Amino acid sequence: MSIVMQLQDVAESTRLGPLSGEVRAGEILHLVGPNGAGKSTLLARMAGMTSGKGSIQFAGQPLEAWSATKLALHRAYLSQQQTPPFAMPVWHYLTLHQHDKTRTELLNDVAGALALDDKLGRSTNQLSGGEWQRVRLAAVVLQITPQANPAGQLLLLDEPMNSLDVAQQSALDKILSALCQQGLAIVMSSHDLNHTLRHAHRAWLLKGGKMLASGRREEVLTPANLAQAYGMNFRRLDIEGHRMLISTI
């Protein structure tokens, strides 16, 4: 797999690093760790929203060399839950994120996959928290999907499963898997270790802004590593062919 992003000694004040790593095309990378581990800080830095020590290369160029317009063509970023900036119909909000605004069928497909069909005419300020989260997810997917944006390379998601029910989480997993198969690199933070164990290709385990472990999900999500990160004991079980992590008292 080709390297999409390379991080070298990335650090921000006392909140992050220094840490190094790489993001590869066609893979799903999960950032896991307790609250305050630095996951959101790292994602914002990788998105080019903040600056600090160390270097980040994106598609072979220094991240700081990218203009905002060009960066938006090659990467999409979902920050943590935020309220709608202003009121507009959902379909209009989604269209604003499309580089090819003629692809109405793609908009409808993505909206349908996230059960937003009947929300397209509703105003963004009339949505529940879960509905707004799904609209935001649909927007970044439409921004970066190779189906309409051949330049799309990287999707960064900060706790995308927030406010989603089980069916909606499954729908998002299917979308992310399809994007990954099309060559997109996906980096997302997660608090659900079992979800990471099922769906991530690789994981970075963070604590206090430091990288405790990185590698394949099975190598990272070990009871020993998790005990170091969370200060509690874990067991890893195999149940009907599925691996599962449980905490022990």
UniProtKB/Swiss-Prot annotation:
Main location as per UniProt: membrane
Binding annotation for ATP: 33-40
Keywords assigned: ATP-binding, Cell inner membrane, Cell membrane, Membrane, Nucleotide-binding, Translocase, Transport
Membrane topology of this protein: Peripheral membrane protein
ABC transporter domain: residues covered: 1-233
InterPro entries assigned: AAA+_ATPase, ABC_transporter-like_ATP-bd, ABC_transporter-like_CS, ABC_transptr_BtuD, Metal_Ion_Import_ABC, P-loop_NTPase
Entry's localization field: Cell inner membrane
Reaction(s) catalysed (UniProt annotation): an R-cob(III)alamin(out) + ATP + H2O = an R-cob(III)alamin(in) + ADP + phosphate + H(+)
EC numbers, comma separated: 7.6.2.8
SMART domains reported for this sequence: AAA
GO cellular component: plasma membrane
Signal peptide: none
Molecular functions per Gene Ontology: ABC-type vitamin B12 transporter activity; ATP binding; ATP hydrolysis activity
Physiological role: Part of the ABC transporter complex BtuCDF involved in vitamin B12 import. Responsible for energy coupling to the transport system.
PANTHER family named among the record's database cross-references: METAL TRANSPORT SYSTEM ATP-BINDING PROTEIN TM_0124-RELATED, VITAMIN B12 IMPORT ATP-BINDING PROTEIN BTUD
HAMAP family: BtuD
Family: Belongs to the ABC transporter superfamily. Vitamin B12 importer (TC 3.A.1.13.1) family.
Subunit-level organization: The complex is composed of two ATP-binding proteins (BtuD), two transmembrane proteins (BtuC) and a solute-binding protein (BtuF).
Protein name: Vitamin B12 import ATP-binding protein BtuD
Originating organism: Escherichia coli O1:K1 / APEC
Upper classification of the organism: Bacteria, Pseudomonadati, Pseudomonadota, Gammaproteobacteria, Enterobacterales
Originating gene: btuD
